[in-house]
Amino acid sequence: REPDEFRAGYIPGAEHVSRGFLELKIEQVVPERDTPIIAYCAGGVRSLLAGQALKSLGYENVKSMTGGYSKWKDMGHTVQVDKQMSTEQLERYSRHFLLDQIGEKGQAKLLDAKVILVGAGGLGSPTGLYLAAMGVGTIGIIDMDVVDMSNLQRQIVHNNDRVGTSKVESAKATLSALNPDVNIISHEYRVDRTNAMEVFKDYDIIVNGADNFPTRYLVNDAAVFLGKPIVDASIFKFEGQATVFDSAGGGPCYRCLYPEPPPPGMVPSCQDAGVLGALCGTMGSIQATEVAKLIVGFGEPLV
């Protein structure tokens, strides 16, 4: 069945392969040629021809469903209809649909996901841009700083005209302009022990781009208590680190790796030591990729 037919409904558990890609993809879907296959289409004609094509490829145990999906539905059998997308969404996310690991089901998961960015700075900027571009449905941003001219070397959600304005509102304007489909929630305050649990509880994933150790430990502790995964990254001069902390999933947390913070002044900040601007883009892109992997369920997270 073709994509538009599949969107209208399908038999739960069925593998979707368009007729035009059948010969190219069948070995990925059914690697063993003695596997029983029941092919179905809308009315039973194309599936009959598809069955003949499969037999020519060595798949001998193939049958065509008489009457196809239409008859199945008319008989009252179970059907499933996924999240319906607008014409604009179908075009915007079309490159995701071509990826077997994402497809329309994966895109629907992205649209339903809620992710919060801790910081709208060097890491939060590129991560936020890619999360918005890929269609993460709800993005929260928590930061209390204002845009400074020195930020513009790396914090790409901000610009000259926004110097002196709220980073959260600047980031919201940029992400909304990139993808109006996304709901951006502003948290224009510093995350601390009085609000961390409350602000994080409504999100699926926490993206940590904090630039100080007290906040990193605070975010970690709240995530552990709430059972939320953290997609974490840090940068220093020309070096970057990225990982996923998912204690609820059986993985370690930030405190497992670093039980105690370094003594004050031992690790200089970007303000004191400097940082390569483009490095933020590299690490932020890794964070966005890890978020997508957690939401959709493809690949192995960097745990």
Which residues does each predicted region cover?
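Glycine-rich, N-terminal phosphate-binding loop of Rossmann-like dinucleotide-binding domains
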Residues: R1, C41, G209-D211
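Adenine nucleotide-associated cytosolic modules
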Residues: R19, R33, S56, D74, ...
